[in-house]
Amino acid sequence: MADAEMAAFGAAAPFLRKSEKERLEAQTRPFDLKKDVFVPDDKEEFVKAKIVSREGGKVTAETENGKTVTVKEDQVMQQNPPKFDKIEDMAMLTFLHEPAVLYNLKERYASWMIYTYSGLFCVTVNPYKWLPVYNAEVVAAYRGKKRSEAPPHIFSISDNAYQYMLTDRENQSILITGESGAGKTVNTKRVIQYFAVIAAIGDRSKKDQTPGKGTLEDQIIQANPALEAFGNAKTVRNDNSSRFGKFIRIHFGATGKLASADIETYLLEKSRVIFQLKAERDYHIFYQILSNKKPELLDMLLITNNPYDYAFISQGETTVASIDDSEELMATDSAFDVLGFTPEEKNSIYKLTGAIMHFGNMKFKQKQREEQAEPDGTEEADKSAYLMGLNSADLLKGLCHPRVKVGNEYVTKGQNVQQVSYAIGALAKSVYEKMFNWMVTRINATLETKQPRQYFIGVLDIAGFEIFDFNSFEQLCINFTNEKLQQFFNHHMFVLEQEEYKKEGIEWTFIDFGMDLQACIDLIEKPMGIMSILEEECMFPKATDMTFKAKLYDNHLGKSNNFQKPRNVKGKQEAHFSLVHYAGTVDYNILGWLQKNKDPLNETVVGLYQKSSLKLLSNLFANYAGADAPADKGKGKAKKGSSFQTVSALHRENLNKLMTNLRSTHPHFVRCIIPNETKSPGVMDNPLVMHQLRCNGVLEGIRICRKGFPNRILYGDFRQRYRILNPAAIPEGQFIDSRKGAEKLLGSLDIDHNQYKFGHTKVFFKAGLLGLLEEMRDERLSRIITRIQAQSRGVLSRMEFKKLLERRDSLLIIQWNIRAFMGVKNWPWMKLYFKIKPLLKSAETEKEMATMKEEFGRVKDALEKSEARRKELEEKMVSLLQEKNDLQLQVQAEQDNLADAEERCDQLIKNKIQLEAKVKEMTERLEDEEEMNAELTAKKRKLEDECSELKRDIDDLELTLAKVEKEKHATENKVKNLTEEMAGLDEIIVKLTKEKKALQEAHQQALDDLQAEEDKVNTLTKAKVKLEQQVDDLEGSLEQEKKVRMDLERAKRKLEGDLKLTQESIMDLENDKQQLDERLKKKDFELNALNARIEDEQALGSQLQKKLKELQARIEELEEELEAERTARAKVEKLRSDLSRELEEISERLEEAGGATSVQIEMNKKREAEFQKMRRDLEEATLQHEATAAALRKKHADSVAELGEQIDNLQRVKQKLEKEKSEFKLELDDVTSNMEQIIKAKANLEKMCRTLEDQMNEHRSKAEETQRSVNDLTSQRAKLQTENGELSRQLDEKEALISQLTRGKLTYTQQLEDLKRQLEEEVKAKNALAHALQSARHDCDLLREQYEEETEAKAELQRVLSKANSEVAQWRTKYETDAIQRTEELEEAKKKLAQRLQDAEEAVEAVNAKCSSLEKTKHRLQNEIEDLMVDVERSNAAAAALDKKQRNFDKILAEWKQKYEESQSELESSQKEARSLSTELFKLKNAYEESLEHLETFKRENKNLQEEISDLTEQLGSTGKSIHELEKIRKQLEAEKLELQSALEEAEASLEHEEGKILRAQLEFNQIKAEIERKLAEKDEEMEQAKRNHLRMVDSLQTSLDAETRSRNEALRVKKKMEGDLNEMEIQLSHANRMAAEAQKQVKSLQSLLKDTQIQLDDAVRANDDLKENIAIVERRNNLLQAELEELRAVVEQTERSRKLAEQELIETSERVQLLHSQNTSLINQKKKMDADLSQLQTEVEEAVQECRNAEEKAKKAITDAAMMAEELKKEQDTSAHLERMKKNMEQTIKDLQHRLDEAEQIALKGGKKQLQKLEARVRELENELEAEQKRNAESVKGMRKSERRIKELTYQTEEDRKNLLRLQDLVDKLQLKVKAYKRQAEEAEEQANTNLSKFRKVQHELDEAEERADIAESQVNKLRAKSRDIGAKGLNEE
């Protein structure tokens, strides 16, 4: 399907099929068939790899991720070529194996293509996300499409089922299976949705619907939410898991419209009603009711909205994130309404649901001094009784004191609390189950319409195969169901394969793969199978689960390959037997099976239910009749038997009904896959998917496919694709049939010719051959393409070379012409020629222009005519094309109708022929059967009489023999069990081993005696003499049967002769058919050729249309050019007239001027050349236009005529060919139907022969039953011991994990402390920076004050200057008045002024110098402010780093929390394992107790043997000799029995001693367990405390971080303020500079007038000196601040160095921690070594047991050995006492070490307290491990030498531990030294801080002194100013 066709699917197209671009990319991907392979992988199951080398049966390959692996050659599997990537049907893969299937699914899943075909299967993978592949657009696109026409989809499966139902008139079924959470329920909904859309019954259903109800489509769809509410629940894998299976039948009418529907359910998980796992929850309806969406429900049911108030529904989770319970309640309620439930029915359902919740809250207590239960409060009982319509007192009485029928009387029975609780649970489960089944029945009644129904499609949604760690009765039922379904699939699949091969004429031996699973099915369901034995045990009152197990072992262990004894693994639930299913071996635990199968109820309460006032409840239990139901006269017995139906029998009955339904349908298979267990979209867990593919039969289907020919291609396609491999085999010119061509082609290739077969229409390939052909094709294509590329490159190079040569020749010609022109262009004659030439043609141009005008007019008229003609032709062509399209559509429709009619006709003819053949065959068979029946009935009657007598006699004998053999087997099994238990005792004490030998020898003697007795019993064969006569009679009857068989064989030979004749006729028919096929293929070939010609003509027509359009465009361009030509011509005309005028003027001028015409001649030449060029262009355009128009007219007319003729011819030929085709098809159908009829007759005859042979084989097999027994005691013991070692290893690993987690916790706490310390250092650095900022701020304030003083001084100078100016003005006026008088005085004053002026200039220079110094001070202050800004930025960076550290710390804290939670889970798992170990210990104790019981049973068996011997003596009383011999044997047996009893008593005494040891070991184990739990609690408390501390630290860090951010913001604000102040100061300083410059100018202008201002100038000089002093003071202050800043920087550097030192010390401590870790690992390794020694001891024990078994022949010396064993026992007791003393000494040593550790802890309490606590905890762990090892070793010591060696090893271990403790002590000392060094560093830092503080105080004191001096100087300055003012005033006054 191309991309254009996929557009019909809309947005779903990319999720259904690869695009063409992807397919092309996949085909061009590099691939090497010989090197690209799959190799096995531990994690990913299989990985892609490339083979590097092969040698010696091994393959070295490099995987995709670069890893090199070496595997066996048979483990390597080839990859498929790229054309098979993401293939839609995996059955078409050329290499069909597990990795190919897995990777195809994985790659499709990665592209979100979740549906894939695998032969008959449709495999769907759960996407865990919404995909747009289910909308109405997709439904419409799949409707009516065949499977091969559309991508894989559940809609395609549904539509194919629907179409098959309509065409084949056969019921269909869709089987949807898979694990929980794989998407079964969703796909079932989609199937129902599809049928509801495409097969809606229309308006009629809407008219007929009842008010309040929905349409039938709505009801079918709404049945799902109603059933989901009561049958779905949350599980670990799936939030909406269906806990029941269902088979939904959707019935259709004859026209394919919906008629009705019904539902059948299977295996509702009713145990979920009262019990749920921790991560699961109960059925949805309970939580929907409690959602409070309908408060009236809560009031009606007397419940709250809290699920935890009800015990039954609150054992797991109560909410699900993906489910809105309130909305679901409304959906359920509306579904009830749509389904037509009455309000009374709805309320009854809700009431029973609420009553079940109240049932779970009913409490009972034990009566004092009685084993009798009584109610503990009646409130919940009252509520539940009210809701159920019962009396509360009667309910409680029925629960606590039920009535039981004993004989013909009823007796009241007392119940204890446990029995009452069980009864309540059983009643709740039964009520819920019956209510659910009633709902299904009620829904079926609603969906049952009165409309006629013809066919149905069944949808089966059932759980897939289940293999859990704990498999019980429910898993057996589910797996049995899947086994039957898989057998059904296998049989169906291979029947289809068989039909395909038969249809294609492939020789094939029929293999019924369905029989592969028959052994397992028979083992479960046949008489004396598992189900049968279970039901038989349920009939016996004293039967238990163990008796059921014993019966299973007796009947099947060793007799059936599918029944095995399981290998119990420690840590997992015990398994009792294993079954080999098709999906794998499953271990089953049988605990509680009898109870589950019987499913008993309290019949007193059931009687109350039957009388309930709640109508629904009484109806649910109306037909219930328990085991105690009264008999109704003569029919009571039958009624009782029929009512007591077990769960297994009911399940088998339902399953048989289901299989009957499925066998009557045409099945379709859907397998749902769960990709991963984390519900992650797009992620595929390879091992999980492979497990499911095995379980759901996909790989089984592949196995069946590989047996046959999985790849098949039509001959035509094969020839087209692979002809390139050998083109000579199929010549191009001549016609060769596709089949013959394929045969020639394959015969010419170098391949294995047994790997393919030729059918009638297809060639069939074995797996792998198609991939080889693809590789050969790729190699051939690469060679051809390489050759084409080489030739193409050669042609292109030659063309390029030719162009270069032509270019060179052209250049040479141009060069020659240019050289010639350059040689003659300056000749005078040439110049004259150039001038005169244009003037000669002016007259000719006028004539030419006139002719051109005329021609132009004619061309224009012709063009208009051609345009009109062209338009007419275009209109005709459009109409012809429309007619052609209409004809094509009509032909297509007629072809479709004809094909449909042909198909229907063929089908009807086939059906008719088949029915006629069947009728004929049946009549013939009926006649034969009647004849045979007449002959056989007489013989049968005679034989039946004889056989009945013989059977009675044989049955009696077989019963007696079976009884004897059964008792013998029971005795043997019990003796085996006894020997097994004796062997277990031998492992503990050697004495018991020898006793066991003696017992076994005695037992062997008993067996020998029994064998002798059996030999004697054989004398009874004399009694069979009478039977031999009867056997002779039977042989006579057998002879008669043989005669009958001979008759049958004669009939068979006759039929074979007929068959040969029919085969010959078939061969003739086949030859005729082949001839007809060849004729038909020739006609098809001619038809294809004609179709190709039609397509070519259509393509030619389209090309002509394109050319017409191009010509039209060209005509338009020509018209535009013509228009441009007209304009150009007008311009030329105008130019010509202008030129003519100019020519006249020029001629006049020439006449006047004479020879001055050279310029005019050149102009005339140019114009003439232009005119000639334009005329040539116009002529060319006109000619070209006329030629194209004529060609177009001619071509158009020819093409139209030709197309019309071709269409007519093609239509006639097509009609003729279609007639011939239909005739040939009819003939071919007749021939094929005849052939099929003959083949079917042959198959039926062969089937009859096979059935007769099978019957004979069954008769023979019944007479050939054998016994098999296998003793697997040794393997079981080895398993147990390996499991024990495995568990101990797991315990060690868990302990190592705990220690690792504690170490991780310690490292995280250390990291937290380091982070805290770093944070404190950063805070200190921040404080230092803040202090520096504050000092800088203070300096800035001082500068501001200084600046204000300077401005005041400047203002004062300004005032002085203005005063001086006024004085100068006064002096000027005074000078003008007194000028004459004081000239001499002025001269002197002038000199003085000059002197003063010089002084003033000096003063101004001094002021300027002062200004420059102030400028320098300003720059220096600016630099300091910049430095402060850098410091501020650094503090900001530090704050950012702190933020980053805070985030990192948060991450670390989150990781630590996660690890803490993981450690918590690990602790819980370790606690669980400890509990499992305790249960194992109790099991061991129980095993010992069972051994005692077995000893007692052995005694009983001896007694039974004695009784059996006595019975035998009574039976053989006829012969006195045998009685005498039996008497002797009895005496011998009694003597041996006494010996055995004495030996057993001794063994019992030793067992009691060992029991005491076990009790002591148990007490020690309990102590260890209590110690572990206490330590775990302490660890929990420590972790909680650490968690709280870390949270507090996080809070404190958060607050400090907030403070840091606030301080940073404050610093930024201050910085901005300082920048603003600095800018203002700069502005003021510049203003002051300008003012000083103006003042200087004024001073210069007033130099002559400063005589009187000298005093003021002196004052100004003094003020200037004061200012200098002030500046010096400020500079000193600034220097002091600078020094202080430098000191602070040094302090920061010192703290940085100390931080680095601390980090270095942290690294050293981490290295020490690693050293401790390595020491811990060495201790763990030593522990593992001790475990290895323990396993060695166990192997030695096993060897000893083997030796004991080999020594069984020496059992006669048991009594003498017993005394020796007693002595050895005393020695062993002495040895154990010695070991006990050694243990006490070692415990004392450990206590001393503990004391030393305590002292070390007190010494290092201050510095390394935490480390010591860790070390102390580790020491305690080591002590516990040491004690545990000592106890285990003390118990496992077997013999003196082994014990001594073990003690030596323990002492060596103790010395090693002591050394390790000494190392730990050294580490503690080092840590103490480290703590002291830390203390010294802290003291040094404190001293440094004190010195810095004293320096700061000193600087502060100096600052205060400087400020005081400044104040003094300022006061002096003020005094001097005042004094100067006074002096100035006095001077003025004096003057």
From Swiss-Prot:
InterPro entries: Kinesin_motor_dom_sf, Myosin_head_motor_dom-like, Myosin_N, Myosin_S1_N, Myosin_tail, P-loop_NTPase, XRCC4-like_C. Transmembrane segments: none annotated. One of its GO terms (biological process) is regulation of heart rate. The modification Phosphotyrosine is found at Y1308. The modification N6,N6,N6-trimethyllysine is found at K129. Limited proteolysis of myosin heavy chain produces 1 light meromyosin (LMM) and 1 heavy meromyosin (HMM). HMM can be further cleaved into 2 globular subfragments (S1) and 1 rod-shaped subfragment (S2). It is found in: Cytoplasm, Myofibril; Cytoplasm, Myofibril, Sarcomere. The gene is Myh7. The modification Phosphothreonine is found at T378, T1282, T1309, T1513. GO terms for molecular function: actin filament binding; ATP binding; calmodulin binding; microfilament motor activity. Pfam families: Myosin_head (PF00063), Myosin_N (PF02736), Myosin_tail_1 (PF01576). Residues 781-810 form the IQ domain. Its main location: cytoplasm. Residues 32-81 form the Myosin N-terminal SH3-like domain. This is Myosin-7. The modification Phosphoserine is found at S1137, S1269, S1510. Myosins are actin-based motor molecules with ATPase activity essential for muscle contraction. Forms regular bipolar thick filaments that, together with actin thin filaments, constitute the fundamental contractile unit of skeletal and cardiac muscle. It comes from Mus musculus.
